[in-house]
Each structure stands twice: as C-alpha cells, then as structure tokens.
Amino acid sequence: MYKQGEPNLWTGRLDSETDPKKFRHFQTVTFEDLSKLEKSSMPSGVGILGYAVDKGVALNKGRIGAKEGPDAIKQAFAGLPDLNQCETLVDYGNVYHDHEELIDTQKEFAMLAAKSIANHRQTFLLGGGHDIAYAQYLATRKVYPTQSIGVINIDAHFDTRAEQESTSGTSFRQILEEDDNTDYLVLGIAQGGNTQSLFDYAKEKKIDYVFADELLNHVSPPIKDMIERFVHEHDVIMFTICMDVIDSAFAPGVSAPAVLGLYPHTVLELAKRIIPSDKVSSVSIAEMNPTYDADNRTAKLVANLVHHFLK
C-alpha cells in the first residue's frame, strides 16, 4: 500500500526564511504522488521513498520494528543543513505491507522505486527490512533491462538464505538465481554471523566479499582497488547498506545488533569508492529499527549517511 509523504515529519531549526545558505532540508523538500509521476526527459535532483515493511524480518525470525524506520530517518534528516543546495528533494512517502505475500509488496515498491530512479540523479530507498534489496533490484532491472548490474552490499550477512518465500535474509540469493547478468560484492561480513553453507554458496556463485576484520582500522589499497574494479566492470551499480553491519555502540537501533561491527567512518570510507560513480542507480539503507534505538542515535546516523551521499 502506497501513501504519500507526511509534511509534518519535516521540521527543524529555522535560521532564515530567505537565505538559501542557511536552509535545512525541511525547508527545501517537496512532496509528490509517485504513482502519478511521468518520466522526465532528463533525470535531476533527489527522490526519497520509504519501505515501511518489516514482514521480511519477522519471516527471517528477527526482531520487528524496522517498519517505523523510514519516518524516523526522515525526521532526523529534515533538520540537517542543505549544504549541497539540491536541485530538487522530493519525499515520495512510503510503501506499507498489506498484501498476503511479501513478494507482492516488494513488486509494488519496485514499480514505484523505478519511477524515482528514472526521474532523479539520486534515489534513496529507506527501510524497513533488508528485503528492500530484492525490491530495489526489481526496480533497477526495470529501468535497465539489458545492462549488467553490480550489486554492492555493506552488510554483516550474505543474506543468501534458501527459503520457500521471500524474507529479509533471501534477497541476494533471489537476485543471483534469477539473473545471470548480475554480480555480488559484500563488504563487512561477520564470521560469526554466517553459516558454512552460506560461505559455500558464496564460493559456488563466485561472490566477492570482505570480512569485517579486514576493515578494522582502515580500508586498505587492495580493498579500495577491488571496489573500484567492481564498479568499473558493470554498467549499473545497485548500492545497499544494512545497518546491522555497524557496531551496536554506534547503531543500537537495528534488527540484529553487531558486537564486532564496523565504525561509521569506515562505512563512509567504503562509500567514497562507490557513491561518486554515475553508475549508481539507487542507494538503499535497511534495518533501522526505532524500537531499539537510543537517543535516536541510529536514525541520526542513517540521516547523516544520506546527507554525506548527496551529490
């Protein structure tokens, strides 16, 4: 079920009503009905769409609450300064789960997300469970039907479980099983968060991955080269971040908190090798769970990631 954006989420400190250099995002955001959006001749500006769904988390036996994530992130983002002075910043609202099957919600979200991807230079998709990634893939493939897609996931988990239905832990297996013209790179894998069968599947499917331990103090030149080569080798990049990759000291409000997770600045350093490329079709950030957040710490962290990713 699709609902348009809520203007009352977008509030913040007012420093000036006339000087754009003192504006914050709540002063520049606009709201549109994405279901009625027509394709523009030239993509421009930024589109934001929320995936207010945690059904996939429940199916994956995780702790629910991530469906409240998109609104919490938007509220935290609203008060940040508009340093980039975006051409346009549009909040398209959220998609909610009201279908019998999760896959139908994912398809509904994909149809709408594809419109944003086609119309904007940047599209941010805010979760919600990491089943958003499969919906993001469907949207990407709709916009780019023949191009090679490189999927980059900053995550503690492979999310390649073999299940009978779509869950927050199956997205990337679904993508790889359905599409031979995609490849998968995972950054931040937790050795204690994935079974041997998932490592075996990664070997079978030639999934590239980097352990969280390898990213402890810095992003080494070989890892930077790996990321840049992966971007270079594909026509389109689908970029996604699962917030459970970040240590729970910084991101307590997630579905599955990390005890040996990455530092936020490491995630930013990794993203610097990805975001600047014009090949990046969209960015999704998943598993922000306000139910378990402390002082809105995780919501603010996601908001600041989006803020840093604006270009």
UniProtKB/Swiss-Prot annotation:
Its EC number is 3.5.3.8. One of its GO terms (biological process) is L-histidine catabolic process to glutamate and formate. Its cofactor is Mn(2+). It holds the Pfam family Arginase. One of its GO terms (molecular function) is formimidoylglutamase activity. Pathway: Amino-acid degradation; L-histidine degradation into L-glutamate; L-glutamate from N-formimidoyl-L-glutamate (hydrolase route): step 1/1. Binds 2 manganese ions per subunit. The keyword Transmembrane does not apply. It catalyses: N-formimidoyl-L-glutamate + H2O = formamide + L-glutamate. Gene3D superfamilies: Ureohydrolase domain (3.40.800.10). Keywords: Histidine metabolism, Hydrolase, Manganese, Metal-binding. The keyword Transmembrane helix does not apply. It comes from the Bacteria. Mn(2+) 1 binds at H130, D155, D159, C242. Mn(2+) 2 binds at D155, H157, C242, D244. Catalyzes the conversion of N-formimidoyl-L-glutamate to L-glutamate and formamide. HAMAP family: Formimidoylglutam (MF_00737). Belongs to the arginase family. This is Formimidoylglutamase. The gene is hutG.
